Regions:
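Bacterial N-terminal signal peptides
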Residues: 9-24
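Vicinal oxygen chelate
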Residues: 46-50, 75, 95-141, 163-167, ...
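Core segments of cupin and vicinal oxygen chelate
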Residues: 33, 39-85, 128-131, 136, ...
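Short beta->alpha transition motifs characteristic of CBS
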Residues: 84-86, 148-152, 182, 288-292
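Boundary of Sec targeting at the N-terminus
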Residues: 26-34
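Short, structured motif recognition centered on aromatic/hydrophobic residues
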Residues: 38-41, 80, 97, 145-147, ...
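N-terminal secretory signal peptides that target proteins for export/translocation
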Residues: 1-6
């Protein structure tokens, strides 16, 4: 029944594309692909215990837990996992993962609270033209951790860089089953010239787009440096992970679609679930984790 419904969704998307006078670009989920959930952010750390203590102390929606025999920090339905690094992880903004962060229902109060608790900030509280307030914390091992205005205090986003943000969004939709947050269908090619940097902070903000996996937004901005982005492996944020009911089936589907496989099927941690690693747009490493 599930496969029949997914096939019907693909057919409907194709019909919409044919009937629309403006021929908007519609990205259909690969046939047979189940809906994913966001699973975890995997960090490299010189001192995982200290890093876990930072996150659980700083964000009251988190707690220390055990996941498949691995020490982890849980934030609602997602996790932070840690690999003990023998050398300091890379922190240069030259990979696809820029930062990650939580929401704040009262930015001014939370910012003052964090300052009073001794949290250091890379970027102080700043207001965007939209009125949104944000700030970047100096996290453990050089990680950049954002808090920003939101209706929730949950872990809400991972911010990415891309050589072609709109193309990357299409990849996440087609191959992983991400949902576009765009307010209107896009027309034309996905490769679009970058705009000039804008304030605040002199950031290149266009073209940009957002897709959602489970409860987490992947916000995709243009890369801020010349030259292609490098692999996320070895950086402070080593990779992100999504979960599927059947990892073996998901991996085979992706392989047939031409997606690069970095790690074949293996056991996830010390549990019964399977896992694998693929490479997504801009050399981002993405782990696939089975749902037990």
């Amino acid at each position: 029944m599930r496969h029949r419904l997914q096939a019907l969704a693909v057919l409907i998307a194709a019909l919409i594309a044919l009937l629309s006078p403006s021929c908007p670009t519609i990205v259909a989920l690969s046939q047979g692909a189940p809906t994913p959930a966001f699973h975890h952010v995997h960090l490299n750390s010189l001192d995982p215990a200290a890093a876990m203590a930072f996150y659980t102390k700083t964000f009251d929606v988190t707690k220390k837990t055990n996941l498949a025999g691995l020490d982890a920090v849980q934030s609602d339905n997602m996790y932070l996992l840690f690999h003990k690094a023998s050398t300091a992880p890379l922190i240069a903004p030259d990979s696809a993962i820029w930062h990650f962060g939580w929401g704040s229902t009262d930015m001014e109060a939370d910012y003052k609270k964090h300052l009073a608790a001794g949290v250091s900030f890379h970027t102080p509280m700043t207001r965007l033209g939209s009125g949104t307030l944000f700030a970047y914390m100096k996290g453990p091992d050089g990680a950049l951790v954002e808090i920003n205005s939101s209706q929730t205090r949950a872990f809400i986003h991972v911010h990415l860089y891309s050589d072609a943000p709109l193309c990357a969004a299409e990849w996440y939709q087609k191959h992983l089953g991400a949902v576009s947050r765009a307010t209107a269908p896009r027309t034309g090619p996905c490769e679009v010239p970058f705009a000039a940097p804008s304030e605040p902070l002199g950031v290149i903000r266009s073209p940009a787009t957002t897709v959602k996996i489970g409860e987490v937004n992947l916000i995709i901005y243009p890369r801020q440096r010349p030259g292609p982005l490098v692999s996320t492996r070895g950086h402070v944020v080593d990779h992100i992970a999504v979960s599927y009911p059947d990892v073996a089936a998901a991996l085979e589907r992706l392989r047939k679609s031409g997606v690069k496989v970095l790690e074949e099927l293996h056991r996830f941690g010390k549990g019964k679930a399977q896992a694998a690693m693929i490479e997504g747009p801009d050399s981002i490493a993405i782990e696939l984790v089975g749902r037990e």
